[in-house]
From Swiss-Prot:
This is Ribosome-binding factor A. SUPFAM superfamilies: Ribosome-binding factor A, RbfA (SSF89919). Its main location: cytoplasm. It comes from the Bacteria. One of several proteins that assist in the late maturation steps of the functional core of the 30S ribosomal subunit. Associates with free 30S ribosomal subunits (but not with 30S subunits that are part of 70S ribosomes or polysomes). Required for efficient processing of 16S rRNA. May interact with the 5'-terminal helix region of 16S rRNA. NCBIfam families: rbfA (TIGR00082). Monomer. Binds 30S ribosomal subunits, but not 50S ribosomal subunits or 70S ribosomes. Keywords: Cytoplasm, Ribosome biogenesis. One of its GO terms (biological process) is maturation of SSU-rRNA. The gene is rbfA. Belongs to the RbfA family.
Length: 132
């Protein structure tokens, strides 16, 4: 019987948990602030990890840039702590990527809500004009 998940998927899940804890407890850079690890993708050889993050202050581009620079600067330290927390032969090289999917999802949701609202308003206007 085939395995349900690849090893890289299981390692990615564990890395996501560990990095979230490390960012919350160990990294003291004020540029980073409130950060959420939304996803982790690990290469098949487990040598590289893309860590997708979002920030609490998503609407401020300069704060996002500063936060990303802080994460890049802290990346070697985070990698060393990750190596201590996990038992891996090779600790992946970490690359932080800002995750815009949440913002895009909210934007799409707002667009759909606006279209529905306009459509309902049009139907109400049509009903009122038919009654006259």
């Amino acid at each position: 019987m085939a395995r349900e998940f690849k090893r890289s998927d299981r390692v990615a899940q564990e890395i996501q948990k560990e990095i979230a804890v490390i960012l919350q407890r160990e990294v003291k850079d004020p540029r980073i602030g409130m950060v959420t690890v939304s996803d982790v993708e690990v290469s098949s050889d487990l040598a590289y990890a893309k860590v997708f993050v979002t920030f609490l202050f998503d609407n401020d581009e300069s704060a996002i840039d500063a936060g990303m620079k802080g994460l890049e600067k802290a990346s070697p330290y985070i990698r060393s702590l990750l190596g201590k927390a996990m038992r891996l032969r090779i600790v992946p090289e970490i690359r932080f990527i800002y995750d815009r999917s949440l913002i895009e999802g909210m934007r799409m949701s707002n667009l759909v809500s606006n279209v529905i609202r306009e459509d309902n308003a049009r139907h109400i206007d049509d009903d009122v004009s038919e009654e006259k």
